[in-house]
Design a protein with these regions (language model features):
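Acidic (Asp/Glu-rich) sequence patches and key acidic residues
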Residues: 1-136
Length: 136
């Protein structure tokens, strides 16, 4: 990976995380998601994202910027294959991404979810279902 684009700005990447749910609701600041399967450490349909507590700890330990966290909970409906197989519902943390294009994480509707090279390296090491494209 190259650190800079031809214009000298740091290279950014557009990512699409694991789309692990179709239904969600927010009540009293808690994002509730009906999981379709056991999600990747980063999952969602931007701008609504959830992460595993382990991923959030890693993001913080690396000093990555551009996000805050909030409450989230996942659940399976009775027809979800994961529920039928007896999979436990994972603990989730809401990942709220800001709009600062200079931060490691950024979400702007016209551009989608973009990340820095540092953030991408960490996500690629931990996530299996992550689509990556050059931003811009």
């Amino acid at each position: 990976m190259s650190t800079d684009q031809p214009n000298g700005e740091p290279r950014r990447y557009k990512i699409d995380p694991d789309p692990a749910w179709d239904l969600y609701d927010e009540e009293d600041g808690v994002l509730s998601v009906e999981l379709s399967w056991v999600p990747d450490p980063l999952a969602g349909r931007p701008p609504e994202l959830v992460a595993s507590p382990e991923l959030v700890t890693a993001l913080s330990a690396e000093g990555l910027t551009g996000y805050t966290t909030g409450a989230a909970r996942g659940y399976y409906n009775e027809y979800t294959p994961a529920a039928e197989e007896g999979a436990a519902v994972p603990e989730l943390v809401r990942l709220i991404v800001g709009e600062d294009p200079a931060a490691d994480f950024s979400f702007v509707r016209s551009q989608g979810l973009t990340v820095s090279e540092r953030a991408l390296a960490l996500l690629q090491a931990r996530c299996q279902n992550l689509t990556v494209r050059p931003a811009g």
